[in-house]
């Protein structure tokens, strides 16, 4: 029987790039693929209903997109039609507590870090199927390369960018995640946040959830896993601050030692420091990053606080 898959795109450019790869792979294997534009989901429901007339093999989605769709109030489509929903998380599960608390029974959660799998098993008992799913890569195709040589890859000696870093400074995005710490009455949230951030920066091998739990234990604040999961999700901005600190320091140290670093992404133009060796090139599309990598001698990458996985 011909396999039939449903995909979602139209919300986040980076996820669209990955989704296109999955669609291409499945299509080459002879599968029938329906790609739903999540940006106009109300108009797309007619196409979705028509596709569901025949048996569907699975939904393949990223970061919960399309997971909570309903044709009728209170009836999740994927549970209603008994369709496996493969949900590939690109980020830590604590960023999606509300969505995952309401996950349909048909969801199979795939995490890109082994620690995230254990986190889900502990803090989301409603999720029965979760597995480690290593992050793959996307190969630059000759049709997409600007280089005119026989290979699509530019020889190292001809590459114009010494060091490339493509990624924003998450500390500015983290500002929007900070809750009203003064409203937390059970403990001194300001002091705990200060201690936790210091621990993360001084011990980068530790996970954010481990440090938050450790700080709570140090003040003898005892809570069950349900409340602990809520607290970790509430303080998840610490993760973004720690990531941003090391991301910024990696670029700054290279620049201060005479290395020219070309950076793309939001936030770099807001840094409190400047260096003639940092070239801020603005924001570009995820697809264009592949070609920029092809023009770079070294591509700098910093893990988003993943300890047993890559991103």
How should these model regions be labeled?
Residues 2, 9-18, 126-307:
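Nucleotide-sugar donor-binding catalytic core of glycosyltransferases
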Residues 7-9, 15-122, 139-152, 278-295, ...:
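Extended catalytic core of nucleotide-activated donor transferases of GT-like folds
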């Amino acid at each position: 029987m011909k396999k039939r898959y449903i995909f979602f795109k139209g919300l986040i450019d980076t996820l669209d790039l990955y989704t296109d790869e999955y669609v291409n792979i499945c299509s080459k294997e002879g599968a029938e693929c329906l790609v739903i534009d999540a940006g106009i989901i109300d108009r797309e429901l007619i196409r979705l209903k028509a596709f569901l007339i025949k048996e569907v093999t699975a939904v393949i989605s990223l970061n919960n997109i399309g997971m909570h769709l309903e044709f009728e109030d209170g009836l999740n489509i994927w549970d209603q039609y008994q369709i496996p929903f493969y949900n590939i998380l690109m980020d830590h599960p604590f960023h999606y507590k509300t969505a995952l608390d309401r996950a349909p029974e048909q969801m199979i959660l795939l995490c890109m870090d082994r620690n995230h799998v254990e986190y889900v098993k502990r803090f989301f008992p409603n999720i029965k199927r979760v597995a480690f799913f290593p992050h793959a890569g996307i190969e630059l195709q000759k049709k997409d390369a600007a280089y005119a040589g026989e290979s699509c890859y530019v020889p190292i000696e001809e590459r114009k960018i010494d060091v490339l870093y493509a990624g924003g400074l998450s500390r500015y995005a983290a500002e929007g995640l900070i809750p009203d710490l003064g409203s937390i009455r059970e403990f001194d949230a300001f002091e705990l946040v200060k201690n936790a951030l210091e621990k993360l920066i001084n011990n980068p091998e530790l996970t954010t959830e481990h440090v938050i739990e450790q700080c709570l234990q140090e003040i003898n604040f005892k809570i069950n896993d349900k409340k602990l999961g809520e607290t970790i999700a509430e303080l998840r901005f610490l993760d973004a601050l720690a990531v941003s600190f090391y991301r910024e320091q990696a670029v700054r140290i290279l620049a201060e030692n005479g290395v020219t670093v070309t950076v793309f992404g939001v936030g770099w133009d807001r840094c409190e420091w400047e260096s003639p060796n940092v070239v801020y090139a603005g924001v570009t599309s995820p697809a264009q990053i592949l070609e920029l990598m092809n023009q770079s001698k070294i591509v700098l990458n910093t893990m988003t606080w993943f300890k047993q996985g890559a991103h």
